[in-house]
From Swiss-Prot:
Highest taxon above the source species: Bacteria
Motif ('HIGH' region): 42-52
Species assigned in the record: Caulobacter sp. (strain K31)
Subcellular location(s) per record: Cytoplasm
Alphabetical UniProt keywords: Aminoacyl-tRNA synthetase, ATP-binding, Cytoplasm, Ligase, Nucleotide-binding, Protein biosynthesis
Catalytic class of the enzyme: ligase
An MF annotation (GO) of this entry: aminoacyl-tRNA deacylase activity
Binding site for ATP: K626
GO annotation, cellular component aspect: cytosol
Protein name: Leucine--tRNA ligase
Motif 'KMSKS' region location, chain numbering: 623-627
Main location: cytoplasm
HAMAP family named among the record's database cross-references: Leu_tRNA_synth_B
InterPro entries from the UniProt entry: aa-tRNA-synth_I_CS, aa-tRNA-synth_Ia, Leu-tRNA-ligase, Leu_tRNA-synth_edit, M/V/L/I-tRNA-synth_anticd-bd, Methionyl/Leucyl_tRNA_Synth, Rossmann-like_a/b/a_fold, tRNAsynth_Ia_anticodon-bd
Length: 861
């Protein structure tokens, strides 16, 4: 028997697919129904990792399956190629970002091709291609003309290491998401996209995304943060500070708690705080200290509450006899509401923590159910639940929601404010102070101001002759590139030296894939045919970054007439990570898995260094990362076990939405499976064999094969790949139990049918093995072009039925019978069942009602 050798087989079939242009999807679509499957395109770091293998293998299963079902499948690949790592490489290694990036793309392209992915490589592009980013500049100018792009001075998150601005979403625990540096607050003139214009549409559109994970929809809804509340003004007690004669405007979502107010707080970046800081060094020092903290809402939420009393007081709008102190507080966000709040410590935890620290009053105004108004007090935790309002004059006795409405009505009647809807979402700051990004197509003229570059002068191409001998943006230091003439007046002018956030690049690439050769940014005809993406696959870490921005840009481009859809991704699947144990030596240094030998004695596992023999500490199972050296190189796995074994393992070990722990024993199991499958094909004799319906073993095998079709189909449709693989394992055991050697004609015929079905079913998972098996069977063409098998309904039908047994209307047991068993026989089996006999003890059976293949009802007394 010939042994299966993936080193020979896999390259052979990849070459055959390439030679036949098997996965080429013509720009002009055909009559087949379309199916667009896309995995989030990778950053070209230079090497793929096992997370890539899992992500792209999943997408490939879907693409191959849909192709076999008769769909015209679009399955493209590209590169999210701009960004800081290329500039870091330039500074650290003395290479140019462009060369470094394209070299990495070339290397990763070959690695991805080695995976046997059914990708249409003719549509490949990188976001750093001038052809691509020139089209991006074109639609950016459209949005600029429409007013969706604007420029203003703003307080921004500044990464002092990368020397660039970060969006709020890119600040993780107060640090830059790439550099890890502590982020600072600075004021810079920046370019923004008006994503807030689409806030309601983005929230409401989530209701249509029923094929998205609920957790992602919730994350986006919370990030946009639509809230209804009250915007109103506190008048200053006494003389108002200069420029604030109208008072201090605040926003609240809890107007029902107005009578519980104990102070008013303003953000350190609030204009009043900055005005006071300019006149008082102590206030200035406090404001500066606040700016050193984390910038995200989560960071501010978790930080120690700090404040400074300004000495100012304001008059309560509903009780003129009451004045409240004005504090500068580090937990108040300038970019939410008005940057000023009234604080009710009894019913807000942040306010309570602050009030306890600075000995400010805590007055409860919402009485929890069952509590006594005369004795209720707030302890360490604020009460944020439902209840009746008290200590609140005209609001007393109302529930929380009714009190909110009444408080808003009263403030509006007094002409001191009005009900308002506010969002946590801020406009998207897209300026980045770096070289390796899409140039913003704007020219600055002293006479004309910012002027868009004429479209016939696009793309604005990055200069190659730049130096990376110091941090910051080399475009600012370029001797010629930035100097140009104004398109409007012809006078001297300068190019914008900021480049676009890389999330702009990935906010529309899926639309460009529909026709990457189009002269316009997006071919309307191609986009109308292919969009939306039917199945998008990627990590949940992009829920409020890439996915939200892509939804926004798609809607903006629809309003420009470039696309017809509002939502870019009809279906979204977020896969889990690939994890591995992490190892350390005695010096606390991380050790690569390839250098570790594991020994198992009973339930105890120990590790030593393969070369030195020194003991190794086995650490936690964590996401594979270069920093912890717990990375397994895909190319090493491909060399040792074959590509198909690696593909199979990452889909078989756990549900795809969960993390999968990489183990050598696991991939070895997948390797053994591929060889066992091949052995079954190899052992099958050639020839035509007649089916024999009287041969029980043959019929059982045929039934198993046709049921397998349904199981695997359902597993792919439901993204339960591991379940489908498990069924394939089970069926292989069934095949082995009916060996070809010495088999009857009926069993050989059943085996031949089952093997043909098996070759088609494993094709999405192990495509190289499937092709070799298909060829071994002598089938015409390639299995990739074969249709998905259809189950024979009669053979796939379950022979057994589980019938519940009810005695006097209560379920007391169940029996298994063959489908179609006569009623008299079912009654006999039911009355002989031990559980039924136990419940009938002492009773007389008066009537038995059998609903064929459904249920047995026994009446007894």
């Amino acid at each position: 028997m010939a042994r299966y050798n993936p080193k020979d087989t896999e390259p052979k079939w990849r070459a055959a697919w390439a030679s036949a242009n098997t996965f080429l999807t013509p720009i002009t679509p055909d009559a087949r129904p379309k199916y667009y499957v896309l995995e989030m395109f990778p950053y070209p770091s230079g090497r793929i990792h096992m997370g890539h293998v899992r992500n792209y293998a999943m997408g490939d299963v879907v693409a191959r399956y849909k192709r076999a079902q008769g769909f015209n499948v679009l399955h493209p690949m590209g590169w999210d190629a701009f960004g800081m790592p290329a500039e870091n490489a330039a500074m650290e290694r003395g290479v140019h970002p462009k060369g470094w990036t394209y070299d990495n793309i070339a290397a990763m392209r070959e690695q991805l091709k080695a995976l046997g992915l059914s990708i249409d490589w003719s549509r490949e592009f990188a976001t750093c291609d001038p052809e691509y980013y020139g089209k991006q500049q074109a639609w950016f100018l459209h949005l600029l003309k429409r007013g969706l792009v604007y420029r203003k001075e703003a307080s921004v998150n500044w990464d002092p290491v990368d020397m660039t601005v970060l969006a709020n979403e890119q600040v993780i625990d107060g640090k830059g998401w790439r550099s890890g540096a502590t982020v600072e607050k600075r004021k810079l003139t920046q370019w923004f996209l008006r994503i807030t214009d689409y806030a309601d549409a983005l929230i409401d559109g989530l209701k249509t995304l029923d094929r998205w994970p609920e957790k992602v929809r919730i994350m986006q809804e919370n990030w946009i943060g639509r809230s209804k509340g009250l915007r109103f003004t506190f008048k200053f007690d006494g003389e108002a500070p200069a420029g604030h004669a109208d008072g201090l405007e605040v926003y609240t979502t809890r107007p029902d708690t107005l009578f519980g107010a104990s102070f008013v707080g303003i953000a350190p970046e609030h204009p009043l705080a900055e005005q006071l800081a300019a006149a008082d060094p102590a206030v200035a020092a406090f404001v500066a200290e606040c700016r050193k903290g984390g910038t995200s809402e989560a960071d501010i939420e978790g930080a120690e509450k700090l404040g400074r009393d300004t000495g100012l007081r304001v008059v309560h709008p509903l009780d003129p006899t009451l004045t409240l102190p004005v504090w500068i507080a580090n937990f108040i966000l300038m970019d939410y509401g008005t940057g000023a709040i009234f604080a009710c410590p009894a019913h807000d935890q942040r306010d309570l923590d602050f009030a306890r620290k600075y000995d400010l009053p805590v007055l409860p105004v919402v009485l929890p159910p069952g509590e006594d108004a005369a004795t209720f007090q707030v302890g360490k935790e604020a009460y944020v639940g439902p209840g009746a309002i008290f200590n609140s004059e005209f609001l007393d006795g109302l529930d929380v929601e009714a009190a909110k409405t009444e408080a808003v009505n009263r403030i509006e009647a007094m002409d001191q404010g009005q009900g308002a809807t506010v969002y946590r979402l801020r406009d998207w700051g897209v300026s980045r102070q770096r070289y390796w990004g899409c140039p913003i197509p704007v020219i600055h003229c002293e006479a004309c101001g910012p002027v868009g570059v004429p479209e016939d002068q696009l793309p604005v191409v990055l200069p190659d002759d730049v130096a990376f001998d110091k941090p910051g943006n080399p475009l600012l230091r370029h001797p010629t590139w930035r100097h140009t003439t104004c398109p409007s007046c012809g006078g001297k002018a300068e190019r914008e030296t900021d480049t676009l956030d890389t999330f702009v690049d990935s906010s529309w690439y899926f639309a460009r894939f529909t026709d990457p050769t189009a002269a316009e940014p997006i071919s309307k005809a191609a986009a109308d045919h292919w969009m939306p993406v039917d199945q998008y696959i990627g990590g949940v870490e992009h829920a409020v970054l890439h996915l939200l921005y892509a939804r926004f840009i798609t809607r903006a481009l629809k309003d420009e007439g470039l696309v017809s859809v509002e939502e870019p991704f009809a279906g979204l699947f977020t896969q889990g990570m690939v994890t591995h144990e992490a190892y350390k030596n005695a010096a606390g240094e991380w050790v690569e898995p390839s250098d570790v030998v594991i020994a198992v004695e009973g339930a105890t596992r120990s590790a030593r260094h393969a070369a030195t023999g020194e003991p190794i500490t086995i650490g936690d199972i964590e996401k594979m990362s270069k920093s912890k050296k717990n990375v397994v190189a895909p190319e090493d796995i491909f060399e040792a076990y074959g590509v198909d074994a690696a593909r199979l393992f990452v889909m078989s070990d756990s549900p795809p939405e969960r993390d999968v722990q990489w183990t050598n024993s696991g991939v070895e199991g997948s390797w053994r499976f591929t060889h066992r499958v091949w052995n079954e094909f190899e052992s099958q004799p050639a020839g035509d064999f007649a089916h024999d319906d009287s041969d029980a073993a043959a019929v059982a095998l045929r039934k198993g094969a046709h049921r397998l079709i349904g199981f695997v189909t359902d597993s792919i449709e439901g993204f339960r790949f591991n379940s489908g693989v498990a069924r394939l394992y089970e069926f292989l055991n069934m095949l082995k139990a009916a060996p070809a050697e010495g088999a009857s004609q009926g069993v050989l015929a059943a085996r031949a049918e089952a093997l043909e079905i098996l070759a088609r079913l494993i094709s999405p998972f192990t495509p190289h093995l499937a092709e070799e098996a298909w060829a071994h069977l002598g089938k015409a063409g390639m299995v990739v072009d074969a249709p998905w098998p259809k189950a024979d309904a009669a053979l796939a039908a379950d022979d057994e039925r589980v019938l519940p047994i009810q005695i006097n209307g209560k379920r007391r047991g169940e029996i298994k019978v063959k489908a179609g068993t006569a009623e008299a026989e079912v009654e006999k089996i039911a009355l002989a069942d031990p559980a039924v006999l136990a419940h009938l003890e002492g009773l007389t059976v008066r009537k038995v009602i059998v609903v064929k293949d459904r249920i047995v009802n026994i009446v007894a007394g």
